């Protein structure tokens, strides 16, 4: 029970997901190389201008990367923030920020993503084509597809 409380602290708050209102929330998580921390300043400045408050934020330092072609972790900083979907201008701001993130060599965590442009995914994940080739080999008829995979052109 103690481990569950530690690993899932929000579960101790009744209906924590309602804090963002009926429109719900999105979780935005990215990783950036050490030495590229100025991207945080740009993010926070823009979110402050939007008056977008996050109920939950987590900053972690990552170590080694996995060998998987679409692996998210790599050496650097990862930041996760939750935001209300009702924040005016948030979607446009994040679209613009995604471009800056790519320019800085960063990438979005695809598992938690619901909005990134499919054109940016190969730029964020240099081994994207390797993933597609593995996928074609393992599932040549394209039987196994998710909505997200179709949206991001992963299949």
Which stretches of residues belong to each language-model region?
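Substrate-recognition/cap regions that form aromatic- and gly/pro-loop-enriched pockets
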Residues: 2-123
């Amino acid at each position: 029970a103690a481990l569950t409380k530690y690993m899932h602290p929000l579960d101790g708050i009744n209906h924590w997901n309602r804090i963002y209102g009926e429109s719900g929330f999105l979780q935005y998580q990215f990783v950036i190389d050490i030495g590229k921390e100025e991207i945080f300043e740009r993010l926070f400045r823009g979110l402050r201008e939007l008056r977008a408050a996050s109920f939950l934020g987590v900053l972690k330092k990552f170590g080694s990367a996995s060998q998987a072609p679409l692996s998210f972790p790599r050496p650097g900083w990862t930041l996760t923030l939750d935001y209300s979907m009702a924040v005016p201008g948030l979607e446009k701001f994040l679209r613009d920020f995604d471009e800056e993130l790519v320019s800085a060599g960063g990438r979005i965590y695809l598992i938690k993503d619901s909005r990134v442009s499919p054109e940016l995914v190969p730029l964020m994940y240099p081994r994207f084509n390797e993933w597609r080739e593995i996928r074609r080999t393992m599932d040549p008829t394209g039987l196994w597809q998710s909505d997200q995979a179709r949206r991001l052109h992963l299949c």
